[in-house]
Amino acid sequence: MAEWISKTLGELTSFISKGIPPKYVDEENENTIRVLNQKCNRNFEISYNESRIHNAAVKKVPENKLLHSGDVLINSTGTGTAGRVAQIFNIPMPTTVDGHMILLRPTKEIEPLYYGYVIKSYQKKIESLAEGSTGQTEI
């Protein structure tokens, strides 16, 4: 029988970063990628409906900030939105997040779905870490 192995979340996270400061454009082309923002993160789910388009020809997006299936996203600013957690699996096009979101990526040692469940279970705690006033709260 296998024994349980105990590890910290930090040991099971391969990458953590805030998103990019995007250069938005109105129309998609071969040089654009999708940018998720806080409006895209609701009820533990990600929706592309409120996503915007970034011109990667003007400002290149680092490869490690392009989303991977299993990444966890946390809203980092705003009263009532800071601390919202969602995990993304369906990435239909090259996508990143803006600077109001935090990107966490699991290591290969953990099942991504389980990694997401663990972080989602701490959403209330993460929300309580937000500091600031007059609607400018930040994690």
How should these model regions be labeled?
Residues 1-20:
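Non-catalytic DNA-recognition/assembly elements of restriction-modification systems
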Residues 5, 31-34, 100:
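A generic secondary-structure signal marking the coil-to-beta-strand transition
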Residues 10-13, 23-58:
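DNA target-recognition patches
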Residues 37, 59-122:
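A short beta-sheet element
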Residues 87-89, 130-133:
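Short amphipathic beta-strand starts and helix->beta connectors
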